[in-house]
Regions:
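Glycine-rich FAD pyrophosphate-binding loop
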Residues: 2-23, 27
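An anion/pyrophosphate-binding glycine-rich loop and adjacent beta-alpha core
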Residues: 11, 181, 187-288
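A short alpha-helix-loop-beta-strand transition element characteristic
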Residues: 16-17, 46-53, 63-80, 188-191, ...
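Glycine-rich active-site loop/strand segments that organize a redox cofactor
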Residues: 25-55
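Short beta-strand to alpha-helix junction loop
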Residues: 47-60, 92-110, 121, 168-176, ...
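Conserved redox-cofactor binding core of oxidoreductases
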Residues: 67-145, 157, 202-203, 224
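Short hydrophobic core segments
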Residues: 149-159, 182, 229
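Flavin (primarily FAD) binding-site architecture
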Residues: 156-170
Length: 288
């Protein structure tokens, strides 16, 4: 099968590349039910249970595949290291330092580039679907000039709408192009009202993409403090609950931000979160 992969910017310019914290994996049969329940709780039981079960049951094999593809998760001679993130009762998050998305995506991109049957067109904008008699025949795209790509199968993997927000950790070009095209062509969409808001980013007044402060920072012990330097929530609740708690505290404090205290982290911060540490140093913040 011949595949044509187009991407709006460069291959690495995806939100997956920006992910820091890690990837959750089932820790054996004894963890299965807990993992499923944690996921259902975080989704307020609106999840598709079958999809959750598939996610959990296939997680170990998926991680093995990533390792075979060259992803080097953090660990030592004794085995891989696990951290904890919001909504998880156990340490079941594998990670690559604090740039997990970068390392996973680079391994996947390397594999894609090795495939002779995959043609890649970067800096190419998807414009619309080609529809005839209620069938999708391909797409219309723009790469300097407008052109069409005919195909038997068309997969829209264009991401969400994070780029349209004023304050976002997403790339600005991630603006829901695929979702918009699907709506125009009456393609069924599901749960598009759900937009995941990450609770913690570095506060800045500019309009640039905000720097993500990984959830695993809280998983390793960092705590949220208000303007009186008082802890006000459980930092490892699901993301929507932590985000809501921060917003409510900001309203009480009449503040545009709250504090994330690194002093409660017992690990070597510079070693565990090297990229976050470097980026904060650039912003004149030393968390050591």
């Amino acid at each position: 099968i011949n595949i044509c992969l187009i991407t709006k910017k460069e291959l690495k310019d995806s939100n997956s590349y920006l992910a820091q914290g890690g990837i959750s994996v089932c820790r054996g049969k004894e963890d299965r039910e807990d993992y499923i329940e944690d996921t259902l709780i975080a989704g307020h039981y609106k999840n598709d249970r079958k999809a959750v079960e598939i996610l959990v049951d296939e997680s170990e094999e998926a991680v093995k595949t990533l390792i075979e593809m060259g992803v080097k998760f953090t660990g030592d001679k004794k085995g891989l290291f696990y951290t904890r993130e919001g909504g998880h009762r156990k340490f079941r998050i594998l990670y690559c330092e604090d740039r997990t998305g970068k390392y996973i995506m680079e391994s996947l991109i390397k594999k894609v580039l090795e495939k002779k049957n995959i043609k890649i067109i970067e800096n190419c904008e998807f414009l619309d679907i080609i529809e005839e008699n209620n069938n999708c025949l391909g797409i219309v795209a723009k790469n300097k000039e407008i052109f069409s790509i005919k195909s038997k199968f068309t997969v829209l993997a264009t991401g969400g709408i994070g780029g349209i927000y004023k304050n976002t950790t997403n790339f600005s070009h991630i603006r829901g192009d695929g979702i918009a095209a699907a709506i125009r062509h009456n393609i069924e969409l599901k749960d598009i009202s759900y937009v995941q808001i990450h609770p913690t980013t570095f506060y800045a007044k500019d309009n640039e993409r905000k720097f993500l402060i990984s959830e695993s920072v809280r998983g390793e012990g960092a705590v949220l403090l208000n303007q009186k330097f008082q802890r006000f929530t459980d930092e490892l609740k699901p993301r929507d609950e932590v985000t809501r708690a921060i917003l409510e505290e900001m309203k009480k404090d009449k503040s545009e931000y709250e504090w994330l205290d690194f002093s409660t982290i017992k690990l070597d911060i510079e070693k565990r979160f090297p990229n976050i540490y470097k980026q904060l140093i650039k912003k004149d913040i030393n968390v050591l």
